[in-house]
Amino acid sequence: MSEVAIKFCGLSRLEDVSAAAEAGARYVGFVFFPKSPRNVSIPQARELALAVPLGIAKVALVVNADDALLDEIVSQVPLDMLQLHGSETPERVAEIRARYGLPVMKAIGVAEAADLDAIDLYAPVADQLLIDTKKPKGAERPGGNGATFDWSLLAARKYWTVPWMLAGGLTADNVTDAVRTTGARQVDLSSAIESAPGVKDAARMQAFSAALTDG
């Protein structure tokens, strides 16, 4: 299988950063959302970001963050991208992109075909899109829930105006099928590379990368 870029999200320890780099990650994500077991403080994220090797993009994941929080994050943590994983409107996405001068990736939750309409709403204002499983009813977290969606919904979409990333329940066992079905050239995962909630596992990172390489 030709090269697929990997984003390991929800890193919270220095050893996670090293393991992600060794496993060939192209992106690493830091979560700023208190309801997530992967939540990091701003000083913690700064320490982690400074340890990321050159060539790996550092992404801050936020959920409906206000300017005060974003100002604090961007001023203290060296970043390459902001990931908006809440219910931010296209207007808010454009506003954040203009305010901070950083590339913005907007997450879009998918459960059925109608959810794909959001792609055309957000593509004009985002630098990338993250196509993730729609948040289950009652779930507190918008992502990182380990659930997949029907990948065939994306199979018919041949034209994308911005780069995109596939997320939602990806594992070493299913990622090859996911990539073949959707045509994704970038993938994002979090819970599948953990030994416990919020605790990343180097062996699982390596296994995921190997599955893509061998597939």
UniProtKB/Swiss-Prot annotation:
One of the GO biological process terms: L-tryptophan biosynthetic process
Metabolic or biological pathway, per its Swiss-Prot or TrEMBL entry: Amino-acid biosynthesis; L-tryptophan biosynthesis; L-tryptophan from chorismate: step 3/5
Alphabetically ordered keywords of this record: Amino-acid biosynthesis, Aromatic amino acid biosynthesis, Isomerase, Tryptophan biosynthesis
MF terms in GO: phosphoribosylanthranilate isomerase activity
Catalytic activity: N-(5-phospho-beta-D-ribosyl)anthranilate = 1-(2-carboxyphenylamino)-1-deoxy-D-ribulose 5-phosphate
Enzyme class per UniProt: isomerase
InterPro entries on file: Aldolase_TIM, PRAI_dom, RibuloseP-bd_barrel, TrpF_fam
EC identifiers of the protein: 5.3.1.24
Pfam families in the record: PRAI (PF00697)
HAMAP family: PRAI (MF_00135)
Family statement drawn from the similarity comment of this UniProt entry: Belongs to the TrpF family.
Protein name: N-(5'-phosphoribosyl)anthranilate isomerase
